[in-house]
């Protein structure tokens, strides 16, 4: 099964989730694997109790993860890692990506680096928390002594529209960075 548990707005505006879903379905077809897709809208009750295995994309809260574990213990999350004690996960190393971006900008002579990002969510509360990309950016920029809070813009969600809006907002500032990590 493919558990495609993205928020409706994420699915429409976050290219990452849509590309992951499309590629999973494409690869499954190539290998003659039938994947039944269950969405967040379908709810946890739609997932069959005799599920053999799953691939999950999107965000689940603690209650949903525990319920899923009672249904099926063989699953892999892509893009998120909600509970590494219960399920495996495949996700990009965002910490390394951001560190490499800041290193690259510094190597190219940039000393003013901006950052546009969004929040993560606490798995237990669902409340916003600092995303690993922002944390990594702050650590890397601090290391190079070039952290400038005026150049850090955080939205309440990860969407193309929000990134565009924050980029335009950054351009209205009196001084702007010479490089930007988005």
Give a label for each model feature.
Residues 1-8, 15-37, 41, 52-53, ...:
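Bacterial carbohydrate/catabolite-sensing allosteric modules
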Residues 8-10, 60-63:
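Short acidic, S/G/P-rich loop/turn micro-motifs used as interaction or catalytic elements
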């Amino acid at each position: 099964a493919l558990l495609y548990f993205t928020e409706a707005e994420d699915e429409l505006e976050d290219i990452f989730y849509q590309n992951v879903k499309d590629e999973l379905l494409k690869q499954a077809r190539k290998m003659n694997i039938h994947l039944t897709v269950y969405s967040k809208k379908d709810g946890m009750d739609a997932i069959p109790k005799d599920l053999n295995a799953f691939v999950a994309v999107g965000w689940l809260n603690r209650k949903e993860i525990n319920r899923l574990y009672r249904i099926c213990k063989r699953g892999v999350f892509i893009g998120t890692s909600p509970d590494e004690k219960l399920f495996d996960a495949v996700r990009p190393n965002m910490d390394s990506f951001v560190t490499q971006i800041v290193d690259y900008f510094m190597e190219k002579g940039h000393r003013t680096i901006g950052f546009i990002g969004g929040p993560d969510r606490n798995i237990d509360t669902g409340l916003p928390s600092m995303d690993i990309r922002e944390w990594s950016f702050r650590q890397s920029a601090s290391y190079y002594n070039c952290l400038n809070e005026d150049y850090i813009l955080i939205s309440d969600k990860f969407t193309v529209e929000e990134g565009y809006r924050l980029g335009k907002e950054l351009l209205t500032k009196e001084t702007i960075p010479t490089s930007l990590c988005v």
